[in-house]
Each structure stands twice: as C-alpha cells, then as structure tokens.
C-alpha cells in the first residue's frame, strides 16, 4: 500500500491510513481500529501495536517483549533492584505486590491453603503441596547417581552433595565443612563448653553426644 503524496509504502492498509494523517495537517491522530485519538503520531503508532500484536519494545535484561514502552518500563523495575511495595507493619520492601501479599501473612497469620486429608492450613500453596506428599507417600525427587528418592527437593539437593563432594555447611568455630547440615550440627557439639573432650569429634564418636547429655 503506497502513499499517493510521498510514495512511501506499507505492508498493511491500516498503517497507510495512520501515515496519511501526517499529510492532512490534522492534530488529532485517530486509530482506525478503535477510534481512540492521540495528540502525537508517535503515540498513535505505539497504541496501534495493541491491535497488530507487534512487540517492539524489548527488555535488555531478559528479552521479554512489550507492545507499549510504558509496560516495558514498569517491567524493568524488577531488574533495577527497586522494591516499590512496602509492608505497612514492618517496613520491608518487595519487588512485586504478590510477594508483599505473601509476606503480610506472617503478620496476619492468614493460612488460606488447607489440606483436605488432615485439615492443616498453610500460608503458601507450595507448603501445602509438600505436606500432601506425607499422605500419598510420593517421592518425586530421584537421585540419578544412586536411585534414592526423596519427598522434598531440599533433601534431594542436600543428598546430591554426597556424590559431588560439595561442602556447603561450614563450622563457624573451626571452619571445617560438611556436606550435610546434620553432620555439622553433630560436629559443633565438640566446641560446646560442657564437652570435656573438645578434641573429640562427635561425628566420629556419635555415642559421645548421648554421654554428654546424660
């Protein structure tokens, strides 16, 4: 579709109609699809993408596309570290309103998700899903190295450190590292004041922990 006044060509007739308004001298730019008017042609052109489905504005951080620049600008705040949503109770800030809503339940005690089996209530859907596995016996997380299965993803991740050799849990006293939190907890008892043999590791001699408690 070509403009008879300047010979500029367009793929769609609607684009040609938008362009012709530049030659008409009319200050009101009207959308041929919905009739909405704009003061500037650039605003009309941006608006027209809503009808064509064209995504022109792309987020540099994640590549997500938007039809309007204002929508992209609002989205980009999530990458800038800005946290515009503030909790009126404690002043903590959040990037998204949904995060604030979840946080506020710590103040209100609201637990909207209930287990139909036990009647227990939870703050988050994810907590309920984890809990329901205790009724079904489901263990969806399987170790590809040894085949051992786990109910919770956190337990699965901790188990995998046995195979990778990754030491994540570190003793704050002597900086010794462990693949499991339970092993770190057992080790830390050797640093306690009531341990008469601090040089002995309760992880090596598990019976010592019981002796000290008695």
Swiss-Prot record:
The keyword Nucleus applies. GO terms for biological process: regulation of transcription by RNA polymerase II. Gene3D superfamilies: Classic Zinc Finger. GO terms for molecular function: DNA-binding transcription factor activity, RNA polymerase II-specific; RNA polymerase II cis-regulatory region sequence-specific DNA binding; zinc ion binding. It holds the Pfam family zf-C2H2. A zinc finger (C2H2-type) spans 1-23, 29-51, 57-79, 85-107, 113-135, 141-163, 169-191. May be involved in transcriptional regulation. Belongs to the krueppel C2H2-type zinc-finger protein family. This is Oocyte zinc finger protein XlCOF10. It comes from Xenopus laevis (African clawed frog). The lineage of its organism: Eukaryota, Metazoa, Chordata, Craniata, Vertebrata.
């Amino acid at each position: 579709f070509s403009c008879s006044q300047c010979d500029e060509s367009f793929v769609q007739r609607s684009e040609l109609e938008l362009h012709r308004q530049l030659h008409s001298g009319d200050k009101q730019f009207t959308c041929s699809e919905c009739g909405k008017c704009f003061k500037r042609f650039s605003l009309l052109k941006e608006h027209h993408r809503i009808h064509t489905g064209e995504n022109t504005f792309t987020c540099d951080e994640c590549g997500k596309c938007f039809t309007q620049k204002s929508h992209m600008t609002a989205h980009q705040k999530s990458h800038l570290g800005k946290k515009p949503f503030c909790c009126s109770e404690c002043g903590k800030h959040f990037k998204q309103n949904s995060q604030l809503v979840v946080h506020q339940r710590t103040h209100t005690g609201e637990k909207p998700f209930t287990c139909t089996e036990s009647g227990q209530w939870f703050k988050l859907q994810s907590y309920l899903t984890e809990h329901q596995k205790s009724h079904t016996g489901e263990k969806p997380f399987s170790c590809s190295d040894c085949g051992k299965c786990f109910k919770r993803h956190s337990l699965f991740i901790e188990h995998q450190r046995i195979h990778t050799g990754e030491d994540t849990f570190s003793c704050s006293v002597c900086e010794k590292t462990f693949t499991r939190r339970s092993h770190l907890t057992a080790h830390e008892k050797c640093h306690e004041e009531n341990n008469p043999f601090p040089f002995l590791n309760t992880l090596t001699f598990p019976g010592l922990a019981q002796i000290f408690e008695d």
